[in-house]
Amino acid sequence: MSTLLAPLHPYAGRVVVVGVSGGADSVALLRALVQAEARPVVAHLDHALRPNSAEDAQWVHDLAEQLGAAHTSTRVDVAAVAARRGWNVEDAARRVRYEVLSRAARQHGAHTVMTAHTRRDQAETVLMGLLRGEAVLTGIPAVRGRVRRPWLDVPRSEIEAYLKALGQEWREDPTNADVTYTRAWLRTEVMPVLAARFPGVEAALGRVAKLAQQDDEALRDLAAALTPHAPRDRVPLAVLRRRVTQELKSAGLQFHVGQVDQLAEAQRTGETRHVTLLGGRGVTVTGGALHLAARAWPLPSFSWPEDWTLRTRQPGDRITLPGGTRKVSDVLTDLKIPRDQRDDVPLLVSAQGVKWIGVEPNIWAKGARAVVGQPADLLDTAMGEALGLAREAALAQEVPVGAVVLGPGGRIIGSGRNTSRADSDMTRHAELAALRAATAELGTAYLTGCTLVVTLEPCPMCLGAALEARVERIVYGASNPKAGALGGVSDLLSSHWGHVPAVTGGVRAQDAARVLRDSFQELRQRRLKSPDV
């Protein structure tokens, strides 16, 4: 019992969100937290994968009531989320589960979230990584952000003995025996065979994870310390693999382990090698340096009038957008297109100016779509919705900013406006409201493939939220010279982040600026009439 309680004593008197499914591990962790005099908040996720899953939710609710613990329960159709996002069910369940735990922590002011992963879970994770050919078998980390996993070294036998000593029952989830799920197959069919020949297999795999985590941390530090032009021929491959991984991730590229191996080996030997990554982006190693291939810019897939010319940019090129006329060079700069690639971007140009810019997605001059029979601009329409929300905010005497989130298919899945004044809360920005609504709609914290459309360039707080949510693209109207995080004050995306969204600025910029200007003029007039406003 001391093995179970010892890591929990530091949390005495503290609010701790604990994920409780009803299974033995999580029920034991809840009981142990109560015994250690912590203040547990029970968070349960009903995955809606079984017809009687609501019975588990009620059972967990009753247990929390008996123990006097706060309780929250959420039902999410995990299978539907998986189908919608292109994930497998196990991955979707994990992502949704941690979002539910994080939400509960925010609601209850908890700085710690605990899960009841045990030595068995760790062993299965390491074995799964080995079978998948993962380069580093680090397994499940004991600490990640606010999440703590105090029982990664605890065998299942100790947990069951603890529950039996308490006379505490638990629930058995039938899906844990469904071998169509990889982890269930490993648990029910593979691990028993290994344990029969190697009785200490769980502890051995757990040791592998712990040592691998220590090694990986040291090697990642060495990789990060490599300067761009330092010779690579004497750098260990283990360090080079991590350096390549860091560079590809910072560029927002997708890849698999074999591609990292090829690039790292080429860096060390000095040979020239080209690798096409997932998604078609090319990477070349020459002279030990990593070079990303230039993008393949899209050409027009439609017919255009005879007086339009297909060419690349020239000095002075301008395009008339719904929000006003802008230099093409400024548009390409806002899109974060590297300087050495801007002269390769195709344009359609008439005597009146640039009509079309060949980036993804295409940028059209005002009225140009109708000339060639193309459908309405999705971003223009979305910005119109955001402007409507900004005007609502202005009427409510809030800072007039509105935002919407477009799902992968282009449908609006979240919207919001500023409510900071009404709520006396400076985190009530339009972007955060729209992101919250979108995550609730999709049932996950990650908005992969989604676009955030906002009338005013985001501040650092809202940009940070978009980065955490893995938003694929940020579109804004007016620049923000007082708090803009995308160039208005500082371009925070110029630093190296794990995920960098594409950025499009200036969409209906004049309309967005007009809403701001009119609102602030009205506010100044009210203050002149009544200084207390």
UniProtKB/Swiss-Prot annotation:
Pfam families: ATP_bind_3, MafB19-deam, TilS_C. GO terms for molecular function: ATP binding; tRNA(Ile)-lysidine synthase activity; tRNA-specific adenosine-34 deaminase activity; zinc ion binding. Residues 377-500 form the CMP/dCMP-type deaminase domain. SUPFAM superfamilies: Adenine nucleotide alpha hydrolases-like (SSF52402), Cytidine deaminase-like (SSF53927), PheT/TilS domain (SSF56037). Keywords: ATP-binding, Cytoplasm, Ligase, Nucleotide-binding, tRNA processing. The keyword Disulfide bond does not apply. It comes from the Bacteria. One of its GO terms (biological process) is tRNA wobble adenosine to inosine editing. It is found in: Cytoplasm. It is an enzyme of class 6 (ligase). Its main location: cytoplasm. Its EC number is 6.3.4.19. Belongs to the tRNA(Ile)-lysidine synthase family. Ligates lysine onto the cytidine present at position 34 of the AUA codon-specific tRNA(Ile) that contains the anticodon CAU, in an ATP-dependent manner. Cytidine is converted to lysidine, thus changing the amino acid specificity of the tRNA from methionine to isoleucine. This is tRNA(Ile)-lysidine synthase. It comes from Deinococcus deserti (strain DSM 17065 / CIP 109153 / LMG 22923 / VCD115). The lineage of its organism: Bacteria, Thermotogati, Deinococcota, Deinococci, Deinococcales.
